[in-house]
């Protein structure tokens, strides 16, 4: 079987289908199969050409194993059936270069494609040409909605983070403010504690100053009531009020303000003439009030041996304060009389630092109400002693009055070991020491009770006779007589005037007072009798101390 080469024939009429204007019915016919394969023998290789007049392009193709019969039938059948000229062939598989002979260059036409002016052709790749179904659209919508939700969640997260930062800053500011408030509170508390300590120190200084003995004592003349007395009244009243506040543990703020205003008015600067006019226009009531204000400063201290916390003196007392005194480990208790409303009598009770068995009771003031029989003796004795103490002048500096002094003999004509007048205390104080046993009286014969009816006038007219009668009185009646005599004698000292000229009355009675005092102090039996009476009175009430204390407190 001959080996030849075959060619691939392309019919150009297929290209004419796109351009119907180029179809030529003169030389060509339309075939159903535009691509025709024809076999070309190797002898006809030289005759191979490309026809420029035809519409076909021949491509020489070398085929092996093709039968000659099939080649002949194929070539003859194509040529016979179609009755047309075989177009030029192009051999793409030939080892030799094909020589293209162009016999008629003018008849060769090149196809020129015209551009299509249609613009509705979509040249893009449309992957969804079949249209989106509902499921596809829902998937797209779901994707878009999820993205929006993510964005919203991120925005909310950013907002929450900003709010958290703001809250953190506010919390930090609140912490700083709380720290500042705590520091301020601590500083204020420390300041308050320091102020309280300073106030306590000032109060202690005031108490120590009140208890400390004074170096110098200004003489006081209670008989001569003139402008000088009126000028010094404000100072005396202020000292008394301050001492009362110290004993009672302090008064209210309103009372302090009122006292300050009153003292400011009293101590306001005035001319001397105005002061003299005010003193001259003073009524006897003013003298009585001044005397009572001064009488409150006089104190009578009684020293007695007693195991009870308080001596039963017949009055009812209420404890309103207690404090520790300097130099004495035993506390000092303060009592006021509760038998009548507004009674000015006060007393202080304290154990002796050297001897705990000795109980010191200090009385101050006069009762303004009737007293029971059990309280008359002690009240009369203390009142008379205070009145006699304030009737003279204090000029002693060493704290002990001279036994030859008229005042010491007038108050209580006892020995210096029993009756003591302290001029160095903050206030004039009479101390009655009942801890020593007095000597027995020489004349102890009981006398009749008619001697108790002797009044003060007979005593003043007959001092020697009255002195002898007083020495013969029973011990239970002697304090009443002594107290009445001393109280009546104090009326002539210028403290309690009822009318008339004070200076004239004091001058007229001065000689009688001197005679009475001389008569009382002449006999030593009077001293022993007085001490025995007071001792018996104190010792007689010791067995009632427990009941009296429960009742009084």
UniProtKB/Swiss-Prot annotation:
Distribution of this protein across tissues and organs: Roots, leaves, shoots, flowers and siliques.
Renumbered residue ranges of the record's region Disordered: 111-152, 221-292, 431-477
Main localization of the protein described in the UniProt heading: nucleus
Compositional bias per record (Polar residues), positions renumbered to this chain: 276-292
Alphabetized UniProt keyword annotations: Activator, DNA-binding, Ethylene signaling pathway, Nucleus, Repressor, Transcription, Transcription regulation
Record-linked SMART domains: WRKY (SM00774)
Biased segments, Low complexity type: 122-133, 444-469
GO process terms (BP): cellular response to boron-containing substance deprivation; cellular response to phosphate starvation; ethylene-activated signaling pathway; negative regulation of DNA-templated transcription
Substitution effect: residue 278 to E: Abolishes nuclear localization
Gene Ontology cellular component annotations, sorted alphabetically: nucleus
Entry's induction text: By salicylic acid, ethylene, jasmonic acid, pathogens, wounding and strongly during leaf senescence.
The entry's DNA-binding region: 306-372
Example GO molecular function: transcription cis-regulatory region binding
Database matches in PANTHER family: WRKY TRANSCRIPTION FACTOR 36-RELATED, WRKY TRANSCRIPTION FACTOR 6
Family of this protein: Belongs to the WRKY group II-b family.
UniProt-recorded name of the protein: WRKY transcription factor 6
Source organism of this protein record: Arabidopsis thaliana (Mouse-ear cress)
